[in-house]
């Protein structure tokens, strides 16, 4: 049975992301773990102990309310909940000590809070510190059957392919088409190594509907944006690596292009 963590701070945005995740991954053969974290404010020792107990009680209460709401929406869903001390990333890490986790689902706060998202939100904390696939669902995203997914690719050598399993499963279960996109600065012919990596990608997705595409643009973020808009992409997958599209996206100054890309659900894969 797949174990999927649903991160929540009890906000409407988090609830929306949870609903999106359950509709995407389904209820058959899946156990969802709703995770909430709490950290006491800075204060004297006595106040901290008292506040810590209060926060824990409020967290547990919130989880019970959320579980009840979700079981009404999805009657056959398998749910567990965890209320733990620490940042949400550390809480997820604690859960993985006892559970083999397939994926994490978290919400992002949309355009009004994009700067906080890029510069150090809980979602980014999860991506940077938890070595698990993460589905990031933008504020207000409603789930619809997915027909087209893009994978922002580079020519980095991949030793193994197991980390691609969530992407492969989504493409297969949604009967979607995968478009693997490389952004090129010029119309140069691929060298032998690049051609070899393209062939490897083709073989990885051999049983699925897929296409390897090129986008000509001097800026990788603008190139990905142009590609996703032109092809009506509904989900963007990326591999969390340094010095790649992923790194540029999450460390770039806030731009109009980034605000547009933030409207797509992201599937962040950890190699």
Task: Specify the residue positions occupied by each region the protein language model found.
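Charged helix-capping and loop-helix junction motifs
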Residues: 119-122, 164-165, 193-198, 250-255
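Structural beta-alpha unit
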Residues: 70-104, 205-256, 260, 264
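Short beta-strand elements of ligand-binding domains
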Residues: 106-107, 134-139, 266-270
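Glycine/threonine-rich flexible loop motifs
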Residues: 113-118, 246-250
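Local beta-strand N-terminus motif with an aromatic residue
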Residues: 1, 100-102, 123, 132, ...
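A short acidic, glycine-rich active-site loop
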Residues: 51-61
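Short secondary-structure boundary segments
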Residues: 36, 108, 182, 240-241, ...
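Small/aliphatic-rich secondary-structure junction motif
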Residues: 1-50, 148-214, 230-235, 261
């Amino acid at each position: 049975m797949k174990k999927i963590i649903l991160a929540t701070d009890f906000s409407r945005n988090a609830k929306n992301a949870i609903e999106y995740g359950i509709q995407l991954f389904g209820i058959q053969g899946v156990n969802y773990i709703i995770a909430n974290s709490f950290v006491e404010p800075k204060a004297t020792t006595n106040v901290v102990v008292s506040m810590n107990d209060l926060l824990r009680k409020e967290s547990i209460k919130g989880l019970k309310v959320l579980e009840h709401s979700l079981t009404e929406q999805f009657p056959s869903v398998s749910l567990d909940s965890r209320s733990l001390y620490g940042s949400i990333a550390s809480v997820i890490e604690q859960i993985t000590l006892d559970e083999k986790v397939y994926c994490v689902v978290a919400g992002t706060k949309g355009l009004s809070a994009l700067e906080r998202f890029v510069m150090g939100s809980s979602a980014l904390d999860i991506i940077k510190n938890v070595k698990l696939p993460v589905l990031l669902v933008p504020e207000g995203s409603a789930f619809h059957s997915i027909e087209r997914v893009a994978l922002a690719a580079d020519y980095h050598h991949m030793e193994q392919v197991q980390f691609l399993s969530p992407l492969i499963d989504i493409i297969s279960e949604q009967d979607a088409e995968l478009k693997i996109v490389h952004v090129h600065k010029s119309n140069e012919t691929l060298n032998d190594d690049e051609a070899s990596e393209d062939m490897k990608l083709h073989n990885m997705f051999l049983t699925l509907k897929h296409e390897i595409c090129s986008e000509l643009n001097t800026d990788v973020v603008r190139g990905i944006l142009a590609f996703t808009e032109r092809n009506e992409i509904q989900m963007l997958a990326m591999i969390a690596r340094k010095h790649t599209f992923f790194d540029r996206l999450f460390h770039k100054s806030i731009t109009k292009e980034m605000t547009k890309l933030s409207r797509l659900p992201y599937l962040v894969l950890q190699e």
